[in-house]
């Protein structure tokens, strides 16, 4: 069952779901709560790497990832990050989210941004039960013009579903949780897959 706005407010009031900083009740409507863009970004560098072998030896994948991903880029409040057509970038939500082990979250981009060509999450929009941390966004500009993205702008909406029971392996309890407690735009850790 997906939570409605009054249930989202109640879950926040009771501390069942945590969103820090807490959004105002005006940002909780229908079945979603708005989230804003943080100030941590990562991009792909100009590079000569012909490809990344996603199933290659762990050491080679790690070396390839280090060659192509930038260090963390911090954008000051009021400044803009420009995402050019055909570019992919990583960023975070301003808010940090904590879910219990019986709630799954879903991130959706804003329709107004999609109509300009901005994909907020390329494919990974599930927030696992037991999640704690900021949500990394996988931005892609499918439009024709560069887009100026500024910290604190409304970037997406979260919705929440109650599971049929409590997850036996919630994200925060898993030893293989690669992005546990993330607070910045962490690049891919596919090299840590088994």
Curated annotation (Swiss-Prot):
Enzyme class: hydrolase
Polar residues bias locations: 180-194
UniProt pathway: Pyrimidine metabolism; dUMP biosynthesis; dUMP from dCTP (dUTP route): step 1/2
InterPro entries noted in UniProt: dCTP_deaminase, dUTPase-like_sf, dUTPase_trimeric
EC number: 3.5.4.13
Binding site for dCTP: 110-115, 128, 136-138, 171, 178, 182
Gene Ontology terms, MF aspect: dCTP deaminase activity; nucleotide binding
GO BP of this protein: dUMP biosynthetic process; dUTP biosynthetic process; nucleobase-containing small molecule interconversion
Family: Belongs to the dCTP deaminase family.
HAMAP family: dCTP_deaminase
Protein name: dCTP deaminase
Organism expressing this protein natively: Actinobacillus pleuropneumoniae serotype 5b (strain L20)
Gene this protein is translated from: dcd
């Amino acid at each position: 069952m997906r939570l409605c706005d009054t249930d989202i407010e109640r879950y926040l009031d009771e501390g069942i779901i945590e969103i820090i900083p807490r959004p105002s009740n005006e940002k909780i409507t229908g079945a979603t709560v708005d989230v804003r863009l943080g100030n941590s970004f990562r991009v792909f560098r100009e590079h000569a790497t012909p490809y990344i072998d996603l199933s290659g030896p762990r050491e080679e994948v790690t070396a390839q990832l280090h060659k192509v991903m930038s260090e963390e880029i911090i954008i000051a409040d009021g400044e803009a990050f420009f995402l050019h057509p055909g570019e992919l970038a990583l960023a975070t939500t301003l808010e940090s989210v904590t879910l219990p082990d019986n709630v799954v979250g879903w991130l959706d981009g804003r329709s107004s941004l999609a109509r300009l060509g901005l994909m907020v999450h390329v494919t990974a929009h599930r927030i696992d039960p037991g999640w704690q941390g900021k949500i990394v966004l996988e931005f892609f500009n499918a439009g024709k013009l560069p887009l100026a993205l500024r910290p604190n702008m409304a970037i997406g909406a979260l919705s929440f579903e109650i599971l049929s029971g409590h997850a036996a392996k919630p994200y925060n309890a898993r030893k293989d949780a690669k992005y546990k407690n993330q607070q910045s735009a962490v690049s891919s850790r596919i090299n840590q897959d088994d």
